[in-house]
Every structure is written in structure tokens, then in C-alpha cells.
């Protein structure tokens, strides 16, 4: 486990002075995969959190105090996530923006609830995160049942009569997304020709690719993360398959193209409407660009999660997690993603997934729009 105070802390001329200054800070946390196979997404979250805290502090802070940011590494490991949640709770930190993986967010949320910590995830899409109706959870992203429906709708309209395969990596996120997509496809009258799983971290997919080839699969839907999806795609091309690969929001990192090279061209994935293109995000995107940082993927979602919390704290005039959560669910909040409102479970009311396509140059664009 790694923890680091990142923002809002400055060394004073003496220990006494600095200790006095630190006492005035409100520490919040961002938790996600800062190391490990999903660390690209951890970097996105950390970048978004750092900028949000810096901007809030520049505008005067919260309740007359500055914010300090603690970054915690769960490596997308459920046990490590639970341990981090217990540590954050014992530290009396009132709010965490996290986690990334649903398999981390779900067990961590229970520990946060026990410790009176409010949790807003920028990225965990498994429906179970909010369906358990814990009082302390919310998300600024959509859900797998929603993006599975969008993916299925695209497949039905564009691959009618074609052979479809569905793969998943057995994780809470990947299996959940594959199941939701399968459910939506089957409801629309499409039966997949192949439904198979693999283990997260696998490198050799030749057996799966060989079966895809035998079954004459036209489109393979992958419920999983970009590393394995990239290897599956590369190995398909090595065997001469022109099968289209489609996946979910975990494909939204340019590391995918570094794995596949030009083979990325034509790959599809679902995600929210490009946050970097929203008018509400322009000023913040410009700040990132000035630092030579691309605020891709979940960078702006993490920024928005902290915006929602800070605005609700100001309105409630307290950092008490239960009072702040009641305030969040009762209002609408101006964020880089636009106005966000939440239902009683903590899901956003404004749901809008779209389909993206990768190009040969390592970029991607929303279908029907110009490239990113």
C-alpha cells in the first residue's frame, strides 16, 4: 500500500508552524490502481484529483480551509482496497474519490460506510456498487447494464446475421459487463456463437483466437481491460483474422494502442460522450494541456467527483459524510462533465453512453464526430 500527501501541504519555517498549518487542512483521498496492470487509469485519477484540489484551493478552499490530497494505491486488488478503506476510515478522512475497479470499490464501500466516509467513484460501473443501497456511495459514471445495452444495440444494428462471440476476464467488472451485453443481445434476438472466459493477466490467447477462427466470428465483444484486449487483438491479426473487437469503457486509454500498434484501427468501445469536448471542461482541459497532460479517460470524471463533494460540503456547511450525501442527492451540481444530479441509490440521472472507434494512428473518436 502506498500513500502520499500530494497537495495542500507546505513545509513551514518550523515544525510548530507547519503542524499548525496542517491542522487547518481537510484531507481527502483518491484511491485506485497507482501501480499494477491498471496503473494507467490510476494516473488518470491522480491527475484529475490533483488538479481539482489545486483549483479548489486557489478559489479559497472549503469551509475556510485548504484541501490536502492523499493518494492510495489498491492495485485493483480487493483485499488491498479493503485495507486502504479501513486506513482511510481510521484517519477520519471524510471523502474518497475512488476506486477504479468495481472489484475494489464494492468491498471498500462497506468499510467506508462503517467509518462514516463518503465515496464517489469516477469509474466503477458494476451495478452492484449502488444496488446494495449503501448510504455513502455514488458514482459520476454510468453502469454496465447501461453500456451493455448501448453495445448490444450497436451490434444488432451493424452486425445483423453475423457471428458474435463474447469473452470475459472473470473479474467483477469484465464478467459483469459481458453478462449485461449478452443479456441485451439475447433480448434483442441475437444469440452469441461463443461465450468464453480467460484469466486477467493472461498473455497467450492463441487457443481462444483459434476457436474464433474456426467459428468464423465476425465480432468479438471483450468484457475486460485494455491489456488483455490488446493482446487478443494483436494475436487475432497474427493469425490473419479480420474479426472486429468491441469492448467497454476500460479501453479508454492510449496504452491500448501502444500494445496493438496500427492493428487498433476499427476497434470499438463504449464510454460517455467525450468529456474533453464538453464546453464545461474547456478551461480545465486547457490547464492540463499547459502541463503537457492529456486529460483522457477518467481524469475529468475524478475531477468532477471532487467538485460534487466540495460544492455539497459548502452547501451543507459541514464535512459530515451523511449530511453531505443527503445534500448531494437533493441537488444538482455544476461540474466539468456538465450538471449532475443523483438518484436515491447514488447513480447519476444523466446517462449517455456512445460508441467510439480507434484509428491506425493511436487515436479514437466518437462515431459520427471528428477525431480526438
Give names to the regions the model predicted:
Residues 2-11, 22-372:
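Extracytosolic ligand-binding ectodomains
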Residues 16-20:
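N-terminal signal peptide c-region/cleavage motif recognized by signal peptidases
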Amino acid at each position: 500500500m502506498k500513500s502520499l500527501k500530494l497537495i495542500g501541504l507546505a513545509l513551514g519555517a518550523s515544525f510548530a508552524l507547519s503542524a499548525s498549518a496542517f491542522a487547518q487542512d481537510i484531507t481527502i483521498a483518491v484511491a485506485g490502481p497507482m501501480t499494477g496492470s491498471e496503473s494507467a487509469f490510476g494516473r488518470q485519477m491522480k491527475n484529475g484529483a490533483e488538479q481539482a484540489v489545486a483549483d479548489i484551493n486557489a478559489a479559497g478552499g472549503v469551509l475556510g480551509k485548504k484541501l490536502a490530497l492523499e493518494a492510495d494505491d489498491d492495485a485493483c486488488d480487493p483485499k488491498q482496497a479493503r485495507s486502504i478503506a479501513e486506513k482511510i476510515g481510521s484517519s477520519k478522512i471524510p471523502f474518497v474519490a475512488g476506486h477504479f475497479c468495481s472489484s475494489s470499490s464494492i468491498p471498500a464501500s462497506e468499510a467506508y460506510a462503517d467509518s462514516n466516509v463518503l465515496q464517489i467513484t469516477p469509474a466503477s460501473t458494476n451495478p452492484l456498487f449502488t444496488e446494495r443501497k449503501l448510504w455513502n456511495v455514488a458514482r459520476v459514471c454510468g453502469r454496465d447494464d447501461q453500456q451493455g445495452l448501448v453495445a448490444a444495440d450497436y451490434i444488432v444494428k451493424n452486425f445483423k446475421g453475423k457471428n458474435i462471440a463474447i469473452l470475459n476476464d472473470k473479474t467483477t467488472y469484465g464478467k459483469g459487463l459481458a453478462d449485461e451485453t449478452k443479456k441485451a443481445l439475447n433480448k434483442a434476438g441475437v444469440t452469441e456463437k461463443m461465450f468464453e472466459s480467460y484469466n486477467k493477466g493472461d498473455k497467450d490467447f492463441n487457443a481462444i483466437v483459434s476457436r474464433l477462427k474456426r467459428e468464423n466470428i465476425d465480432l468479438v465483444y471483450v468484457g475486460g481491460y485494455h491489456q488483455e484486449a490488446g493482446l487478443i487483438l494483436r494475436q487475432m491479426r497474427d493469425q490473419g483474422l479480420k474479426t472486429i473487437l468491441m469492448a467497454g469503457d476500460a479501453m479508454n486509454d492510449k496504452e491500448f494502442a501502444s500494445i496493438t500498434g496500427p492493428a487498433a484501427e476499427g476497434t470499438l468501445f463504449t464510454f460517455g460522450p467525450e468529456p474533453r469536448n464538453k464546453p464545461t471542461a474547456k478551461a480545465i482541459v486547457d490547464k492540463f494541456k499547459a502541463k503537457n497532460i492529456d486529460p483522457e479517460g477518467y481524469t475529468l470524471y475524478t475531477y468532477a467527483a471532487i467538485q460534487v463533494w466540495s460544492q455539497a460540503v459548502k452547501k451543507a456547511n459541514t464535512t459530515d459524510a451523511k449530511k453531505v450525501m443527503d445534500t448531494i442527492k437533493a441537488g444538482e451540481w455544476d461540474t466539468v462533465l456538465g450538471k449532475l444530479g443523483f438518484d436515491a441509490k447514488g447513480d447519476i440521472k444523466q446517462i449517455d453512453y456512445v460508441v467510439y472507434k480507434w484509428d491506425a494512428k493511436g487515436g479514437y473518436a466518437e462515431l459520427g464526430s471528428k477525431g480526438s
